[in-house]
C-alpha cells in the first residue's frame, strides 16, 4: 500500500508522533479508573461480596461488549468521512462520558455510561487506519509497532497514576481528571493531525459483501481477525487469577500487592521494547514469519508458567511473553494493510477491533471458569492449547494465501 504524493506532503512521520501521543493519552485515560472501579461500584450502593464481584465484572465487560458492536459502524463512517474526524469524535465523546461518570448517582447510571463509553470509543483503531493509509508499505510494520507502544505506555502508567490520584483526591475527581486528559487528546488531534481525505457518498460506499469481494484473500483476513481475538483471550484469561496465583507462589509476605503489580506490569514493559524492533524486522523478513514465531514462542512460555515455584520465575517468563506479545498485534495489523485497500481500511481495522473486544470479554470469563474448576495452573495450560490452535489455523491460512499485490 503506497501513499500518494499528497500523503508525503502531509508528513506521515509527524502524524505518527501525534497519533502515538493520542493513543498514549487515551490508553492512560481508560486505565486511570481501573484500580478503583470496584470501590466506585461499592460507593454507588452495591454491597455484599458476591454482588460487588458481579457488578464489577459487568461494568468492566460492558464497555468492551458495546465497543465490539459499535466498531464496524464507526469504521464505515471513517471510510466515508475520514479518519481524523473519527479521532476527534472519539476523544470528545469519551471525555464527556467521563465527566458524567464522575457525577453518577447509582449503579444503573454508571452501567449505562460504561456502555456509552464503549459505543463512543474507537480512537486506537482509527489511529491505526490513519497511519496505515499514509505510511509507505515497506515501513508499515515499524510504524504500526511503534504506534502500538503508545496505548501500551498509557495503559502501564494509567493504573499507577489513577491509584495515586484516588488516594489523594478521592474517587470522583479522578473521572474529571481523566476527562481533561481526553480533552487534551482532542485538542492535540485537532491542531496537529493532518489528513487529506476526499469524502465518499453513501451511494458510492462498498457494502459488506463488496468489501469481502475486494479483499485479495478473505480467508486470510478472517484468520487475522480470529488471531486478534485469541491474542486478547490469552492475555485476558490470566488477568483474573494473576494476583491470587502470585499469592499462592509467594506464601505469607507483606508486599503481595507490590509483587503482583510488578509481575502484571512487566509484559507491557517488554512489549514497549520489542514492538518497534520486531515490527522493523517484520518489514525485512515478512510479518507472517514474525507472527508465527511469536505465537510459537508464546506457547513455549505459557506451558512452564504452570509449573513455576516462585513469583520471580513467573515474572521472568511473563517478561519474555510480553516481548513476544509486542510483535503479535502489529504483525496482524501489517498483514491487514498488505491484504486490503485504503478505501476499506477504516472498516477492516474496526472489524479487527470488534474481534479484539470480544477477546477482552471472553478471556477473563474463560480464565475465571477454568481456575474455579481446575485450579490456577490449569489456566496457563488451557491458554497454551488455545494459542497452539491459533498457530495451526494461522499457518494454514498464511500458507494458502495468494501472492500479495499492492492495492490503494
Swiss-Prot record:
TM spans (from-to): 16-36, 58-78, 92-112, 115-135, 146-166, 173-193, 224-244, 253-273, 290-310, 319-339, 378-398
Cellular component, GO, one term: plasma membrane
InterPro entries per UniProt: MFS (IPR011701), MFS_dom (IPR020846), MFS_MdtG_subfamily (IPR050497), MFS_sugar_transport-like (IPR005828), MFS_trans_sf (IPR036259), Mutidrug-R_MdtG (IPR023692), Tet-R_TetA/multi-R_MdtG-like (IPR001958)
A molecular-function term among this protein's GO annotations: transmembrane transporter activity
Main location: membrane
Membrane-protein topology: Multi-pass membrane protein
NCBIfam families: PRK09874.1
Main function: Confers resistance to fosfomycin and deoxycholate.
Protein name in the entry: Multidrug resistance protein MdtG
Amino acid at each position: 500500500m503506497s501513499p500518494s504524493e499528497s500523503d508525503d506532503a502531509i508528513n506521515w512521520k509527524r502524524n505518527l508522533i501525534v497519533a502515538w501521543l493520542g493513543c498514549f493519552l487515551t490508553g492512560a485515560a481508560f486505565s486511570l479508573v481501573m484500580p478503583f472501579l470496584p470501590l466506585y461500584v461499592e460507593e454507588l450502593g452495591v454491597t455484599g461480596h458476591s454482588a460487588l464481584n458481579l457488578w464489577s465484572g459487568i461494568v468492566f465487560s460492558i464497555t468492551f461488549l458495546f465497543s465490539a458492536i459499535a466498531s464496524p459502524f464507526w469504521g464505515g463512517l471513517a471510510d466515508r468521512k475520514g479518519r481524523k474526524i473519527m479521532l476527534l469524535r472519539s476523544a470528545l465523546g469519551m471525555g464527556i462520558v467521563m465527566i458524567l461518570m464522575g457525577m453518577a448517582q447509582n449503579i444503573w447510571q454508571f452501567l449505562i455510561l460504561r456502555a456509552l463509553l464503549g459505543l463512543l470509543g474507537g480512537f486506537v483503531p482509527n489511529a491505526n487506519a490513519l497511519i496505515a493509509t499514509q505510511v509507505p508499505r515497506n515501513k508499515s510494520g515499524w510504524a504500526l509497532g511503534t504506534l502500538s507502544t503508545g496505548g501500551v505506555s498509557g495503559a502501564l502508567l494509567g493504573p499507577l497514576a489513577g491509584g495515586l490520584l484516588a488516594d489523594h483526591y478521592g474517587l470522583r475527581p479522578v473521572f474529571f481528571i481523566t476527562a481533561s486528559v481526553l480533552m487534551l487528546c482532542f485538542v492535540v488531534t485537532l491542531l496537529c493531525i493532518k489528513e487529506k481525505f476526499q469524502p465518499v457518498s453513501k451511494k458510492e460506499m462498498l457494502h459488506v459483501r463488496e468489501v469481502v469481494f475486494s479483499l485479495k484473500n478473505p480467508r486470510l483476513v478472517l484468520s487475522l481477525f480470529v488471531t486478534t481475538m485469541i491474542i486478547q483471550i490469552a492475555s485476558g484469561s490470566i488477568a483474573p487469577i494473576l494476583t491470587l496465583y502470585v499469592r499462592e507462589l509467594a506464601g505469607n509476605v507483606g508486599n503481595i500487592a507490590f509483587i503482583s503489580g510488578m509481575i502484571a506490569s512487566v509484559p507491557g514493559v517488554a512489549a514497549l521494547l520489542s514492538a518497534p524492533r520486531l515490527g522493523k524486522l517484520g518489514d525485512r523478513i515478512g510479518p507472517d514469519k514474525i507472527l508465527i514465531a511469536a505465537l510459537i514462542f508464546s506457547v513455549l512460555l505459557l506451558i512452564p508458567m504452570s509449573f513455576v515455584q516462585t513469583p520471580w520465575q513467573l515474572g521472568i517468563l511473563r517478561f519474555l511473553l510480553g516481548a513476544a506479545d509486542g510483535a503479535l498485534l502489529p504483525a496482524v495489523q501489517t498483514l491487514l494493510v498488505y491484504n486490503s485497500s485504503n478505501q476499506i481500511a477504516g472498516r477492516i481495522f474496526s472489524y479487527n477491533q470488534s474481534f479484539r473486544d470480544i477477546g477482552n470479554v471472553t478471556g477473563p470469563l474463560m480464565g475465571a471458569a477454568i481456575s474455579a474448576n481446575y485450579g490456577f495452573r490449569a489456566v496457563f495450560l488451557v491458554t497454551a492449547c488455545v494459542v497452539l490452535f491459533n498457530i495451526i489455523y494461522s499457518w494454514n491460512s498464511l500458507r494458502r494465501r495468494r501472492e500479495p499485490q499492492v492495492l490503494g
